Each structure stands twice: as C-alpha cells, then as structure tokens.
Amino acid sequence: MFTAFAEEGHKRTQEIEVNKGWNAIFLEVDPEINDPESLIEGTPIDIVATLYRRKSTAQFSSDPNVNLLREQGWSVWRAKDRPDAFLSDFPIIAGGRAYLIHSKTEFSWSVRGEQSIFSKINWQTNSFNLVGFNVEKNAGPSFEQFFKHSKSHKESPIYRLKNGKWVLVEQKGAELMKSGESFWIYCDGASDYSGPLELKMRSSVAGLVVGKSGGSVDLINLTDHPLDVSMSHHVPSGKIQPIDLAVRVIDDLYDPIKTEPLDLGLGKWSYPIKMLEAREAIKVPFIRQADEMLNNQQKSLLEFKTDLGTNHWIRVTSVR
C-alpha cells in the first residue's frame, strides 16, 4: 500500500533568490512540475538554459549570451512571449543540475519537489564545468575550504556570475560558496570529487533503502583536519518514519555480537554523529522498526552537515 506520505517523504522546498538579469543557480530538487512552461508560469523568468555534455574543451565567454547562442551543448527554454521562443529545445527541468536563468525582475523563487538523487559529479576532464553543491544557506564554506583537498580542483580557476558577467574568484579563501549558486570551475584530469565529506551507499541509485537487513551510509573525511558531522532526519509534518541508528553490542552475555537500535523517536530528529579525524571513515548503520510502520513503504530525508558548512541530502525508503 502506498500513501500520500510515501510520496511526500522525499520532498522539500528550495528557496532561491533571483536577481534581475542573469543568474547562475543550482537546483537541488526535482520540481513537482518539471515542464518549463508550467513551472515558470507567473514568474519574471524568460530564459532558462543548462549545459549537457560539451563537445569540446573550448574556453567559455564571460558573457552568458555568448555561451547560450554560440557554444554547443546547451539546451535553452525561452518564454513564449519572446520572438525567439520557437527556438526552445528544453524538455524538462530536473534537480541536481546547474542552470543559467534570466529574469526581468528580482524575486524569491520557491521550488518544491523531491530531493534529487544523491550522486557524485560526473566531471568532464580537462575542461570547465558548470556545477553547484549543497551548502548551508548563509554559512557555506570558502572555495578554498571546499576544494583544497581535490588535486583536480585546488589550483583550478573558478568563475562566479556577478552583475551579469563571469568574474574570476581571486581570493578563494575569502569568498564563500552560496546555497543554490552554480559556477564555472576547471577540472584538471579525471575526478569524482563532490566535497570534503564523501558519502557512499550500496543503494545510491534509489537513495538509502532500509529493509529487513537494514542499510548504511559510509562517511569519509577527505580533508587533513577533523570534521564535525551531524545528521538530521526530516519527515512531513505530523508524520512518522520509524528508522533508528543501529549500534553494535559486543559484550552481551548471551549474544556477544548483535545489533540494537539507538532509539531517536519516530519523527524528526537530529543527532551529532562524531568528530571525524583526518582521512577517517565510519559506517552509519540504520534499521527499520517494522512493528511501528503504518505502510509497506515509507519515505523521508536524511541530511548530513559538517562544521565547514557543507550538507548532503539523501532520500530514505523504509520497506517493511
């Protein structure tokens, strides 16, 4: 049996501050309405563009208009009241992607949808990539803090959009990354780097699936210093999602090695995992409380935060 809660459990709302003119955004959710015409209806946005695979490693122009009109690999949507609307070739708007959008005025854009599937970035080697990352709103890391431990990016030039032009980030230690922002960065060689905290899951295609045998998330500190990591569990208001952390008990008299739940409640909760030392990796196991499950399948979100200001969102599906 599937319920509205099962569908709502993976959803959240992303708030994006849109400026007049060109904006470089990173969309973190898969919109409930992914048709560009319907999603953008009623907003002052008149152009949306995203870059799929570049066919060359050519340098980009500092002018967004040139990128859209002359470079290969762009899909562009244009509002129907524009004279060039017939050139639109943009089927859907999906999460986990960087976009250039043009707005006639500034406004606050609320986009609701399912958290996009967690995955590592598919970097194009020896090329500039238009990318974005999940970071804390108003408290993100500096570009240096985020990229200094990636050999493919630590010395790479970064360009962010300011007043409609791409501007080189000259002081990486002083400029902070922003939630919902995308930027250009050069990838020197092959890489799958996605931030100072790496997450791994066996069932990463569908998110974290917690079934009869449980599930787990591996956390790896890729930096040369400690990282303070915390975790939050998000469920729709008034709903429950019975999953718990699992702990290993090794000194029980009758069952010397067994798994027991660390009861954190049935709804929303937060838990300070631990301080991860430099290069340390840990496994965070979960078990579902089948007796408390109201449906055969229930969904929620896990958010992992670091004291650097990075965060990772993961879809969770518990199966009875």
Describe each model-derived feature in a short phrase.
Residues 103, 187, 217-225, 235:
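Asparagine-centered strand-capping/turn motif at beta-strand->loop junctions
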Residues 192-209:
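Low-complexity, acidic Ser/Thr/Pro/Gly-rich terminal tails and inter-domain linkers that flank the onset
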Residues 110-112, 195-196, 225-233, 243:
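Short, hydrophobic/aromatic beta-strand segments
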Residues 240-293, 311:
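Intrinsically disordered, low-complexity Pro/Gly/Ser/Thr-rich segments with frequent PxxP/GP/PP motifs
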Residues 4-197:
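N-terminal exported-region signature
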Residues 93-97, 179, 210-217, 280-282, ...:
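Short, solvent-exposed loop/turn segments enriched in Ser/Thr/Gly
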